[in-house]
Amino acid sequence: CGGCEAGSAGKDAFHLRVRVHPFHVLRINKMLSCAGADRLQTGMRGAFGKPQGVCARVAIGQVLLSVRCKDGNANHAQEALRRAKFKFPRRQKIIVSRKWGFTKFSRTDYLKYKSENRIVPDGVNAKLLGCHGRLAARQPGRAFLEAVGN
């Protein structure tokens, strides 16, 4: 996903977020299958097992990867995700979000709030300034805002 995306759109043209991580440890209780093995092992007594690998526990419909990019690079991002989904088991879907980047605001709301100077950048997210807090800290003419309908 990253190599295809970086090759066509450039390395600074997208932001990839991996939403699931492999924290679940898979273990194996090795059993001997040779002659005299019954004298060496204890069966299921103390069968905790040794770590064999790790995996991610994923629910049906859970988001695995998220990519944000500019509208001009959207086709490159979709192609990269299409190639990447073959590396995952089962059937995967590519869904184009109606939100702005990784924020919780829709595109139209984000652009409206940005033109009103009500959006404050907060890392990869954005905060919406509401009508709470000290009046002295507000901009002139911005003391009382209409309620936000999310």
From Swiss-Prot:
Kindly state which keywords UniProt assigns to this record, in alphabetical order: Ribonucleoprotein, Ribosomal protein
Please give an example of a GO cellular component term from this record.
Answer: cytosolic large ribosomal subunit
- Signal peptide coordinates: none
Q: Name one GO molecular function term.
A: structural constituent of ribosome
Pfam families this protein is in? Answer: Ribosomal_L16 (PF00252)
Sorted alphabetically, which InterPro entries does this protein's record hold?
Ribosomal_uL16, Ribosomal_uL16_CS_euk_arc, Ribosomal_uL16_dom, Ribosomal_uL16_euk_arch, Ribosomal_uL16_sf
Question: Its GO biological process terms?
Answer: translation
Q: How does it assemble?
A: Component of the small ribosomal subunit. Mature ribosomes consist of a small (40S) and a large (60S) subunit. The 40S subunit contains about 33 different proteins and 1 molecule of RNA (18S). The 60S subunit contains about 49 different proteins and 3 molecules of RNA (25S, 5.8S and 5S).
Extract the PANTHER family matched here. 60S RIBOSOMAL PROTEIN L10
Known NCBIfam families for this protein? Answer: PRK04199.1-4 (NF003239)
The record's family statement is:
Belongs to the universal ribosomal protein uL16 family.
Q: What is the protein name given in its UniProt record?
A: Large ribosomal subunit protein uL16
